[in-house]
Design a protein with these regions (language model features):
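N-terminal amphipathic alpha-helix/helix-capping segment at the start of soluble metabolic enzymes
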Residues: 1-57, 90-101
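Alpha/beta enzyme core
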Residues: 46, 51-99, 103-223, 228-251
């Protein structure tokens, strides 16, 4: 059994070398089924392999947080500028017009709110993802959380199993435990574990040394926004992330 003594710093990332096994515009997807490739092609531009994803799923743990009080007024006008939207099924069916013609990354797990510690996390039924014509399902993986790491890993695996059955990719969303340092070593661990468990996309945070995170992950990595930043800083963050290997952003 591996232990922390064997968790040595990696350094051979092959920066600048593309995968020898990719003949598809989405990293790591060459051997996927037709349906999986089709859905990923809706999210990632076939000409660039990149995506701008608009995330507004925050309400499922934070309620009507600032800027998301009225999805119909604040978010719907922005949808046309995104390649893909990420939201919950409740918001999708109540607030997003069905004729927007944008791929949906459906938030597919649910658990505690910000009022409590994470104590339970469950998956929605795969039939709902199909019913909402989801192009991907988003599921959290909480690395370094002694209480929830195994549970969220099991949820991720279950979602991948269901997604593979019906040709729907899964995006692993990394939530790093409180006791873990927010650095490239641990974001690389969380991202790689998502990919190793079958996630087709990984959402994580930008950090110093992010090029290691992206290079060591065999599927596309998109970055989360985190705390609100001034516009110029947010754009610089996105620019740096893409330069360091991110396939895009998933920000709200």
């Amino acid at each position: 059994m591996a232990d922390m003594d064997g968790f040595r710093e990696a350094n051979n990332f092959g920066f600048g070398q593309t995968s020898q096994f990719d003949n598809f515009h989405v990293k790591g997807a060459s051997n996927y089924s037709w349906g999986m490739k089709d859905r990923l092609s809706r999210i990632f531009n076939p000409k660039t392999g990149r995506a701008v994803m608009l995330a507004f799923d925050h309400g499922f743990i934070m309620g009507p947080t600032s800027g998301l009080e009225r999805i119909d007024l604040n978010i719907v006008p922005l949808v046309q500028y995104a390649d893909c939207i990420m939201c919950t099924r409740g918001i999708l069916q109540t607030s997003i017009p069905a004729n927007i013609n944008k791929p949906v990354c459906l938030r597919s797990d649910a658990g505690s709110t910000i009022l409590t510690e994470l104590n339970r996390n469950v998956l929605i039924d795969i039939e709902d993802a199909i019913r909402y014509n989801a192009s991907a399902m988003a599921v959290m993986f909480s690395a370094g959380d002694g209480e929830q790491e195994a549970i969220t890993a099991a949820n991720l695996v279950e979602a991948v199993d269901m997604g593979n059955r019906y040709g729907i990719p899964v995006m692993g969303v990394t939530a790093v435990g409180k006791q873990m340092a927010r650095d490239s070593r641990y974001f690389a661990l969380a991202s790689r574990v998502c990919a190793e468990n079958g996630a087709s996309i990984v959402k994580t945070y930008y950090c110093d040394g992010f090029e290691k995170v992206a290079a060591a992950c065999p599927v596309p990595v998109v970055i989360a926004g985190g705390k609100k930043l001034p516009e110029k800083e947010a754009l610089e963050l996105c620019y740096n992330a893409v330069n360091d290997g991110a396939a895009g952003v998933d920000m709200g």
